Protein backbone atom coordinates (compact mmCIF):
# COMPACT_ATOMS: atom_id res chain seq x y z
CA UNK A 1 0.00 0.00 0.00
CA UNK A 2 1.71 3.21 -1.17
CA UNK A 3 1.45 5.82 1.55
CA UNK A 4 3.11 9.16 1.73
CA UNK A 5 1.67 12.51 2.65
CA UNK A 6 0.67 13.20 6.23
CA UNK A 7 -2.92 13.71 5.11
CA UNK A 8 -3.00 10.22 3.56
CA UNK A 9 -1.34 8.69 6.63
CA UNK A 10 -3.77 10.23 9.11
CA UNK A 11 -6.69 9.36 6.80
CA UNK A 12 -5.57 5.72 6.86
CA UNK A 13 -5.51 5.82 10.68
CA UNK A 14 -9.05 7.28 10.68
CA UNK A 15 -10.25 4.04 9.07
CA UNK A 16 -9.44 2.19 12.32
CA UNK A 17 -11.82 4.34 14.41
CA UNK A 18 -14.29 2.38 16.50
CA UNK A 19 -12.24 -0.77 16.05
CA UNK A 20 -9.91 -3.15 17.87
CA UNK A 21 -6.28 -3.86 16.92
CA UNK A 22 -4.95 -7.15 18.32
CA UNK A 23 -1.43 -8.39 19.08
CA UNK A 24 -0.72 -11.71 17.35
CA UNK A 25 2.36 -13.93 17.29
CA UNK A 26 1.37 -16.52 14.66
CA UNK A 27 -0.60 -16.62 11.39
CA UNK A 28 -3.20 -18.78 13.20
CA UNK A 29 -3.75 -16.07 15.83
CA UNK A 30 -3.97 -13.44 13.08
CA UNK A 31 -6.76 -15.43 11.41
CA UNK A 32 -8.63 -15.67 14.75
CA UNK A 33 -8.28 -11.88 15.15
CA UNK A 34 -9.53 -11.20 11.62
CA UNK A 35 -12.50 -13.57 12.03
CA UNK A 36 -13.35 -11.89 15.34
CA UNK A 37 -13.61 -8.53 13.58
CA UNK A 38 -10.26 -6.87 14.37
CA UNK A 39 -9.57 -3.85 12.13
CA UNK A 40 -5.82 -4.65 12.10
CA UNK A 41 -3.28 -6.92 13.78
CA UNK A 42 0.04 -6.14 15.44
CA UNK A 43 2.60 -8.79 14.45
CA UNK A 44 4.97 -9.74 17.30
CA UNK A 45 7.32 -12.54 18.30
CA UNK A 46 6.24 -12.23 21.95
CA UNK A 47 3.24 -10.49 23.47
CA UNK A 48 4.08 -7.84 26.12
CA UNK A 49 3.29 -10.20 29.03
CA UNK A 50 6.00 -12.59 27.77
CA UNK A 51 8.46 -9.76 27.11
CA UNK A 52 7.91 -8.65 30.71
CA UNK A 53 8.24 -12.19 32.12
CA UNK A 54 11.29 -13.21 30.09
CA UNK A 55 13.24 -9.96 30.36
CA UNK A 56 16.34 -9.35 28.23
CA UNK A 57 16.46 -7.00 25.25
CA UNK A 58 13.22 -6.88 23.26
CA UNK A 59 13.78 -6.04 19.60
CA UNK A 60 11.85 -5.84 16.33
CA UNK A 61 10.30 -9.20 15.39
CA UNK A 62 11.85 -11.48 12.77
CA UNK A 63 10.67 -10.20 9.34
CA UNK A 64 9.84 -13.82 8.40
CA UNK A 65 7.18 -14.02 11.16
CA UNK A 66 5.73 -10.66 10.10
CA UNK A 67 5.59 -11.72 6.42
CA UNK A 68 3.83 -14.98 7.35
CA UNK A 69 1.22 -13.01 9.30
CA UNK A 70 0.82 -10.56 6.40
CA UNK A 71 0.20 -13.50 4.05
CA UNK A 72 -2.43 -15.02 6.36
CA UNK A 73 -4.85 -12.07 6.61
CA UNK A 74 -6.41 -9.37 4.45
CA UNK A 75 -6.62 -6.70 7.18
CA UNK A 76 -3.72 -4.24 7.75
CA UNK A 77 -0.68 -5.54 9.61
CA UNK A 78 1.31 -3.39 12.04
CA UNK A 79 4.66 -4.19 13.64
CA UNK A 80 6.73 -2.68 16.45
CA UNK A 81 10.19 -1.09 16.39
CA UNK A 82 12.33 0.13 19.25
CA UNK A 83 12.15 3.83 20.15
CA UNK A 84 14.72 5.66 18.01
CA UNK A 85 15.68 2.63 15.90
CA UNK A 86 15.11 4.01 12.41
CA UNK A 87 16.88 1.07 10.73
CA UNK A 88 14.33 -1.38 12.16
CA UNK A 89 11.68 0.97 10.71
CA UNK A 90 13.43 0.93 7.31
CA UNK A 91 13.32 -2.89 7.35
CA UNK A 92 9.60 -2.95 8.19
CA UNK A 93 8.86 -0.42 5.46
CA UNK A 94 10.86 -2.57 3.00
CA UNK A 95 8.80 -5.70 3.75
CA UNK A 96 5.56 -3.77 3.31
CA UNK A 97 3.93 -3.48 6.74
CA UNK A 98 0.95 -1.13 6.80
CA UNK A 99 1.78 0.71 10.04
CA UNK A 100 4.77 0.91 12.39
CA UNK A 101 4.46 1.23 16.18
CA UNK A 102 7.48 3.00 17.69
CA UNK A 103 6.95 1.23 20.96
CA UNK A 104 8.05 1.53 24.58
CA UNK A 105 7.19 -2.19 24.94
CA UNK A 106 10.49 -2.96 23.18
CA UNK A 107 13.84 -1.98 24.69
CA UNK A 108 14.60 1.62 23.57
CA UNK A 109 17.50 1.95 21.12
CA UNK A 110 17.91 5.69 21.68
CA UNK A 111 17.21 7.39 25.00
CA UNK A 112 17.25 10.91 23.58
CA UNK A 113 15.72 10.79 20.11
CA UNK A 114 12.61 9.26 18.63
CA UNK A 115 12.51 8.33 14.93
CA UNK A 116 12.07 11.12 12.37
CA UNK A 117 8.84 9.70 11.03
CA UNK A 118 8.54 12.25 8.19
CA UNK A 119 11.24 10.32 6.31
CA UNK A 120 9.00 7.28 5.89
CA UNK A 121 6.09 6.61 3.54
CA UNK A 122 4.57 4.13 6.01
CA UNK A 123 2.58 5.76 8.85
CA UNK A 124 3.57 5.47 12.52
CA UNK A 125 1.65 5.10 15.77
CA UNK A 126 3.32 6.21 19.02
CA UNK A 127 2.44 6.06 22.70
CA UNK A 128 1.79 9.13 24.86
CA UNK A 129 0.97 9.68 28.53
CA UNK A 130 -0.01 13.33 28.19
CA UNK A 131 -0.62 16.13 25.69
CA UNK A 132 3.03 17.23 25.49
CA UNK A 133 4.21 13.72 24.57
CA UNK A 134 1.42 13.32 22.01
CA UNK A 135 2.16 16.62 20.27
CA UNK A 136 5.93 15.95 20.21
CA UNK A 137 5.31 12.62 18.51
CA UNK A 138 2.90 14.24 16.01
CA UNK A 139 5.53 16.92 15.32
CA UNK A 140 7.95 14.08 14.49
CA UNK A 141 5.41 12.70 12.00
CA UNK A 142 3.26 10.24 13.98
CA UNK A 143 -0.10 9.70 12.22
CA UNK A 144 -1.77 8.05 15.21
CA UNK A 145 -1.40 8.21 19.01
CA UNK A 146 -2.24 5.63 21.69
CA UNK A 147 -2.09 5.69 25.45
CA UNK A 148 0.95 3.90 26.80
CA UNK A 149 -0.90 2.25 29.67
CA UNK A 150 1.25 -0.45 31.26
CA UNK A 151 1.53 -3.19 28.64
CA UNK A 152 1.60 -6.85 29.61
CA UNK A 153 -0.02 -6.33 33.02
CA UNK A 154 -3.71 -6.89 32.28
CA UNK A 155 -4.22 -3.83 34.50
CA UNK A 156 -6.09 -0.95 32.87
CA UNK A 157 -5.33 1.71 35.51
CA UNK A 158 -2.43 3.39 33.64
CA UNK A 159 -4.34 3.53 30.35
CA UNK A 160 -7.20 5.21 32.23
CA UNK A 161 -4.76 7.67 33.79
CA UNK A 162 -3.23 8.56 30.41
CA UNK A 163 -6.63 8.98 28.73
CA UNK A 164 -7.96 11.21 31.51
CA UNK A 165 -4.73 13.23 31.62
CA UNK A 166 -4.88 13.84 27.86
CA UNK A 167 -8.47 15.10 27.95
CA UNK A 168 -7.85 17.20 31.06
CA UNK A 169 -4.91 18.91 29.35
CA UNK A 170 -6.89 19.38 26.12
CA UNK A 171 -9.69 21.08 28.10
CA UNK A 172 -7.10 23.26 29.82
CA UNK A 173 -5.64 24.36 26.45
CA UNK A 174 -9.13 25.28 25.29
CA UNK A 175 -9.57 27.47 28.36
CA UNK A 176 -6.46 29.53 27.56
CA UNK A 177 -6.55 32.86 25.76
CA UNK A 178 -4.74 32.94 22.41
CA UNK A 179 -1.97 35.12 23.84
CA UNK A 180 -1.28 32.45 26.50
CA UNK A 181 -0.77 29.57 24.06
CA UNK A 182 2.89 30.27 23.26
CA UNK A 183 3.92 30.10 26.92
CA UNK A 184 1.98 26.85 27.35
CA UNK A 185 3.58 25.37 24.21
CA UNK A 186 6.98 26.15 25.70
CA UNK A 187 5.96 24.65 29.06
CA UNK A 188 4.90 21.29 27.58
CA UNK A 189 7.65 21.22 24.93
CA UNK A 190 5.32 21.10 21.93
CA UNK A 191 5.14 23.18 18.72
CA UNK A 192 2.92 26.26 18.95
CA UNK A 193 1.02 25.34 15.74
CA UNK A 194 -0.12 22.03 17.22
CA UNK A 195 -1.09 23.59 20.56
CA UNK A 196 -3.11 26.19 18.64
CA UNK A 197 -4.81 23.39 16.63
CA UNK A 198 -5.82 21.63 19.86
CA UNK A 199 -7.08 24.94 21.28
CA UNK A 200 -9.24 25.51 18.19
CA UNK A 201 -10.56 21.94 17.75
CA UNK A 202 -10.69 20.49 21.28
CA UNK A 203 -8.99 17.22 20.36
CA UNK A 204 -5.73 15.78 19.06
CA UNK A 205 -4.97 16.35 15.36
CA UNK A 206 -4.76 12.55 14.88
CA UNK A 207 -6.66 9.42 15.96
CA UNK A 208 -6.08 8.46 19.62
CA UNK A 209 -6.42 4.80 20.67
CA UNK A 210 -6.34 3.16 24.08
CA UNK A 211 -3.56 0.65 24.77
CA UNK A 212 -1.81 -1.02 27.68
CA UNK A 213 -3.50 -3.36 30.14
CA UNK A 214 -6.87 -3.84 28.42
CA UNK A 215 -7.96 -7.40 29.28
CA UNK A 216 -11.78 -7.58 29.33
CA UNK A 217 -14.73 -6.31 27.25
CA UNK A 218 -15.54 -3.99 30.16
CA UNK A 219 -11.99 -2.53 30.05
CA UNK A 220 -12.36 -1.87 26.32
CA UNK A 221 -15.78 -0.22 26.76
CA UNK A 222 -14.42 1.89 29.63
CA UNK A 223 -11.70 3.31 27.37
CA UNK A 224 -14.29 4.16 24.71
CA UNK A 225 -16.35 5.99 27.35
CA UNK A 226 -13.20 7.97 28.18
CA UNK A 227 -13.19 9.37 24.64
CA UNK A 228 -10.75 7.04 22.91
CA UNK A 229 -11.19 6.34 19.18
CA UNK A 230 -10.55 2.60 19.47
CA UNK A 231 -8.55 0.00 21.37
CA UNK A 232 -5.31 -1.98 21.10
CA UNK A 233 -5.42 -5.32 22.92
CA UNK A 234 -2.10 -7.04 23.52
CA UNK A 235 -1.64 -9.91 25.93
CA UNK A 236 -5.29 -9.81 27.08
CA UNK A 237 -6.66 -12.04 24.31
CA UNK A 238 -4.15 -14.79 23.61
CA UNK A 239 -3.09 -15.08 27.27
CA UNK A 240 -6.69 -15.84 28.26
CA UNK A 241 -8.59 -19.15 28.49
CA UNK A 242 -10.70 -18.79 25.31
CA UNK A 243 -8.98 -16.36 22.90
CA UNK A 244 -11.49 -16.74 20.06
CA UNK A 245 -14.48 -15.91 22.26
CA UNK A 246 -12.69 -13.09 24.12
CA UNK A 247 -11.54 -11.52 20.84
CA UNK A 248 -15.12 -11.45 19.52
CA UNK A 249 -16.40 -10.13 22.85
CA UNK A 250 -13.93 -7.22 22.93
CA UNK A 251 -14.77 -6.23 19.33
CA UNK A 252 -18.49 -6.20 20.22
CA UNK A 253 -17.83 -4.29 23.45
CA UNK A 254 -16.04 -1.52 21.55
CA UNK A 255 -18.82 -1.31 18.95
CA UNK A 256 -21.58 -1.29 21.62
CA UNK A 257 -19.77 0.44 24.49
CA UNK A 258 -22.88 2.50 25.25
CA UNK A 259 -25.17 -0.52 25.62
CA UNK A 260 -24.85 -2.19 29.07
CA UNK A 261 -27.06 -5.11 28.02
CA UNK A 262 -24.73 -6.04 25.16
CA UNK A 263 -21.73 -5.56 27.47
CA UNK A 264 -23.29 -7.91 30.03
CA UNK A 265 -23.96 -10.49 27.33
CA UNK A 266 -20.42 -10.42 25.86
CA UNK A 267 -18.82 -10.52 29.32
CA UNK A 268 -20.41 -13.90 30.15
CA UNK A 269 -18.55 -17.20 30.14
CA UNK A 270 -15.30 -15.99 28.56
CA UNK A 271 -13.05 -18.46 30.36
CA UNK A 272 -10.13 -17.34 32.50
CA UNK A 273 -8.81 -13.82 31.83
CA UNK A 274 -5.04 -13.30 31.81
CA UNK A 275 -3.70 -13.39 35.36
CA UNK A 276 -2.53 -9.78 35.45
CA UNK A 277 -0.06 -7.84 37.58
CA UNK A 278 -0.77 -5.36 40.35
CA UNK A 279 1.21 -2.23 39.43
CA UNK A 280 2.30 -1.75 43.05
CA UNK A 281 4.42 -4.88 42.58
CA UNK A 282 6.34 -3.41 39.63
CA UNK A 283 9.80 -1.98 40.24
CA UNK A 284 10.39 1.48 38.80
CA UNK A 285 12.64 0.08 36.04
CA UNK A 286 9.89 -2.39 35.03
CA UNK A 287 7.44 0.40 34.16
CA UNK A 288 7.41 0.50 30.37
CA UNK A 289 5.29 3.67 30.11
CA UNK A 290 8.20 5.80 31.36
CA UNK A 291 10.29 4.94 28.29
CA UNK A 292 10.50 7.73 25.71
CA UNK A 293 9.97 11.39 26.54
Curated annotation (Swiss-Prot):
GO terms for molecular function: pyridoxal 5'-phosphate synthase (glutamine hydrolysing) activity. Gene3D superfamilies: Aldolase class I. CDD domains: pdxS. PROSITE patterns: PDXS_SNZ_1 (PS01235), PDXS_SNZ_2 (PS51129). The keyword Lyase applies. Catalyzes the formation of pyridoxal 5'-phosphate from ribose 5-phosphate (RBP), glyceraldehyde 3-phosphate (G3P) and ammonia. The ammonia is provided by the PdxT subunit. Can also use ribulose 5-phosphate and dihydroxyacetone phosphate as substrates, resulting from enzyme-catalyzed isomerization of RBP and G3P, respectively. Belongs to the PdxS/SNZ family. This is Pyridoxal 5'-phosphate synthase subunit PdxS. The lineage of its organism: Bacteria, Thermotogati, Deinococcota, Deinococci, Thermales.
Amino acid sequence: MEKGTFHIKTGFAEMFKGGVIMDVTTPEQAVIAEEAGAVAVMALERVPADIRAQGGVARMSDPKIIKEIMAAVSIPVMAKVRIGHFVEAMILEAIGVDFIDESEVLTPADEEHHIDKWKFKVPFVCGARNLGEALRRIAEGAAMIRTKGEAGTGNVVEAVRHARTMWKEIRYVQSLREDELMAYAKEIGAPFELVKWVHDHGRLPVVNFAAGGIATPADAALMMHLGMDGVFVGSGIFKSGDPRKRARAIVRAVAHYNDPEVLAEVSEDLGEPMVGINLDQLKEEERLAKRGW
